[in-house]
């Protein structure tokens, strides 16, 4: 048994040795793997080191494509980029969209792309519109609906095709492009009417209204596109802006500013009078013979707002033989009756031209045609402008515009020229004599105690007056008066526009300007306050008579010839002290002493008691029993209208008010005038 075991051992060892000869061990496999790896590494090119300064730098793209932007990878300027070409996305490679700033949130994405210039606007719809021989425009309905969704979709409504089928020559209406609002209308009206008279005679006037089943208006939806720079003739390439949207906004502001003060002339209407129907823009209507483009505002079609009924269907004032045709019924008869009143507030006109910011008169506001005859002048002017005969009739669809003939009947505003101020002032104002008159009035009206209080207040600012006026000569004083009159010229418009009682005084307290509301509240007429009529007021607020005439304050007051007129009925401006009661006058001059040479922007808000204007007859009437019953009725019923305001304080002659006033200085830093407004009665 042992011999067999030992004999089999070499055999097993020999078998194992055979296996080792055929199969390599683990060490041999590791060496072979290292050899193959080193061989592959030696054959492959070395990768560029990111920190190597000599490596070629890739050019930074101005804007990455959408795919590279999503993947946060470096892109190139070429389209399609190399990365999209490798991935097979060259057909979908386009510029990515950056996050817009807040002030550009409403801008279209394409408008913010740099370098697009004026090529962003898509003129595909405009270029694909063939013009027929009769001047109308034919558009594919499908194309219109698809392109219209990009802008402002407007509700569909009936289109009114008023045009002629007779072909027009090309040189009759030369223009830059079908959508450009600038049209060269240099033909005279006589020549234009002669060239179109044959077509008008050959074809009878007809107005066709197409329903929903008929072809819709091709310019209903996308006709008004504010992103088109050609619409306002903007040259965006000449504007130094980084993006197109900013240049378009700047150009629009400039376009609005240049036409803000223009009148609705023919040139103004030619710049922006593209109407609702495209067929009427390139031809002359056979009903009137009047051109549909670039003529007077009365003949204009609605402005660039497509078929919007709220903006285009406003009926306008027409001749009595012209009937209104309210298309969409925006103004029913029940809702328009209040607008036909002559005292209705004037609204800004939506004129055909973009430069009209005028307010039309009440006769040009939307109203119902009453059918009665207007003046013959109005009929002649309308017929002349529209080309109609005396008995011609036609339905009219227009927008409210400022007719030329309506300027003759509207409220005329007087022309004011500030140059008259400098021409009229030849002498300096006599402030010294006016202060003497004020001193005499204070001594005559107030008690010695209150006169002393007012004198102390004026004495506190007397050194400042002397210091500021000692170097002024005659020319300076004349210039000072011109400054006062020029400032007062500006305040007149402010007083007329302000709805609260307002007065303007000189530094002496003399009334220089007054508003209508102040006269209604106090009963003081404007001419009396300004010294144009005699002052017959006897109401002093129940102030006590002055003391003995031998007071020390009257000894040094100069007596000049001007004081002789300081009697009831004197023709000179009223002092502010005559409009207030005793306590209010003392309080005013104490505040004036603090504010005259103090804060130049300061103001005073306090209460006072205004004195009503009362003659001797008014004082007797105030004591009657009838007036007592009227005051009781007024106290129960309240205040209604101007009559109620006039009755405020009619019994005791005082109206308690809250008011605000300030001091305005001239170029020499001297108090020039006192502006007092917001006299609100305490009811």
Swiss-Prot record:
Task: List the subcellular locations.
Answer: Nucleus
Q: Which InterPro entries match?
A: ERT1_acuK_gluconeogen_tf, PAS_13, Zn2-C6_fun-type_DNA-bd_sf, Zn2Cys6_DnaBD
- Its signal peptide is none
Entry keywords, A to Z: Activator, DNA-binding, Gluconeogenesis, Metal-binding, Nucleus, Transcription, Transcription regulation, Zinc
Is Transcription one of the keywords?
yes
Q: What is this protein called?
A: Transcription activator of gluconeogenesis acuK
Instruction: Enumerate the Gene3D superfamilies for this protein.
Output: Zn(2)-C6 fungal-type DNA-binding domain
Q: What residue spans carry the Polar residues bias annotation? A: 151-218, 264-287, 314-325, 376-408, 537-565
Q: Which GO terms describe its biological process?
A: cellular response to starvation; gluconeogenesis
> Which SMART domains does the record cross-reference, listed alphabetically?
GAL4
- GO MF annotations, alphabetized: DNA-binding transcription factor activity, RNA polymerase II-specific; RNA polymerase II transcription regulatory region sequence-specific DNA binding; zinc ion binding
The protein's matches in PROSITE patterns, at most eight in alphabetical order, are given as: ZN2_CY6_FUNGAL_2
